[in-house]
């Protein structure tokens, strides 16, 4: 996930698809208008200020390894996760895992986020 203003589109505008989610608040999935691959999602809790970018859509995905694996309770048994990266069965409390700088960035986003 990253601040929306740090995401640079190389061409075109994504096609936004409103999709139900387990929270009941839904999510907006932004897709490439040509191939329809999901590029990022926006979840209701974070609004439009944070994008959950699909790392496989980046020019250099190897530069952005995961910080944590989530929802591992539903992973396939043949998927082997490295022990060097935290893994949790569902979601997690950010303050338990995120570095101080990331927590500060989240705080800044929340304080700048317009009221709904």
Locate predicted features.
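A short Gly-Trp-Pro
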Residues: 1-116
């Amino acid at each position: 996930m990253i601040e929306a203003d740090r995401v640079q589109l190389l061409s075109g505008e994504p096609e936004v698809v409103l999709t139900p989610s387990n929270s009941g608040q839904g999510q907006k999935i932004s897709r490439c208008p040509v191939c329809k691959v999901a590029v990022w999602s926006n979840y209701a809790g974070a609004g439009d200020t944070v994008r959950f970018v699909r790392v496989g859509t980046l020019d250099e995905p190897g530069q952005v390894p995961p910080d944590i694996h989530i929802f591992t309770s539903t992973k396939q048994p043949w998927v082997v996760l490295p022990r060097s990266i935290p893994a949790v069965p569902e979601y997690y409390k950010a303050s338990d895992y995120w570095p101080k700088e990331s927590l500060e960035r989240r705080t800044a986003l929340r304080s700048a986020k317009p009221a709904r």
